[in-house]
Amino acid sequence: MNHNHSHLQIPIESDDSSWRQRCNRRMEELKNTQFSSQDAAASSQPVRLLLHKELVGKVMAHELYNAVEDGNVDNFVGVLNQQCRKRKLSLSDIFYQVTGAGDSLLHVAAYHKKEHIAELIAHHFPELLIRRNVRGDTPLHVAVRSKNSNIVHLILSQYAIKKSNHDEMNDKEITRKANEHGDTPLHETIYSGDVDVIKQVFFADNDVVHYLNKSRRSPLYLAVVNGNVEILNLLLEISFPVDLPQCLGNSPLHAALLERKS
C-alpha cells in the first residue's frame, strides 16, 4: 500500500507531533498484521522468556541496526515493515532479536542517541526497558554512558508510565538494575561525569547513591574519589540511612577519603 511508503524520506526533525502520530499508527498496523509462518507463531512467546545470553542466537538483521543508527524514524518503521514481510515474522519477534552482544533495538537507539526511535520502541515494547545484554546492561546503562540527558529522561519517563500496566516490570526498579560489575545506572553516571545525566538518575531514585557494586563501592564513594565538588554536593543533599552499607569496611566518605590520601 502506498501510504506505508509515502513518508519514508521525511526527516525526523519534521513537525514534532506529526511523526509520533504517523509512526504510532503504522506500528499498530504492523502489530495487528498476521504473517504466514508457523515458525513465527511458535517462537513468539518462548523468545520473551529467554535469558539475555540465550537471546544472542536471535540475531537482528543488519538493516534494522543501520536504520536505528541512521536515526530517521519513518525509515525505521519502513524497515520494520520490510523485515516482517520478508522474514514472515511478527513485529514482536523482530523486537526480541538482538545483536551479537545481546543488545536490543532499544539498547542500540540509546547508544546512538536516537531519541524518536527510542521513544517509539519504549512506547510499543516497554518490556525492552528492563532487557539486559550479555554484560547485564539495561538500555538505561547504555543511555547514561551516551551522556545524552534527553535519552535518559525519555527512558526513565517511559518506564514510569508503563510500569503499572506490565506485570513483568512491576517489581523491577530500572534505576536499581545492576550489570555484571554490580554497577547501577547511577554508578555509571558518576563514571561518565555528566552532571545533567547524574541529576536525571539521582532525582529518579536517590536511595541508589548508597548501593554497593561488586567492588564494594557506592556512587557516593565514587563521587568523593573523583573529587567533583558539584557532583558531590548534589549527592550529599539526601540524608544518610542508619543501616548504611559499608564500603571497604568503612563509611562511603571515610573509605573514599582514605583512598584519596593513599
Label the model's feature ranges.
Residues 80-92, 120-128, 154-173, 200-208, ...:
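Ankyrin repeat domain, specifically the short helix-to-loop turn at the C-terminus of the second helix
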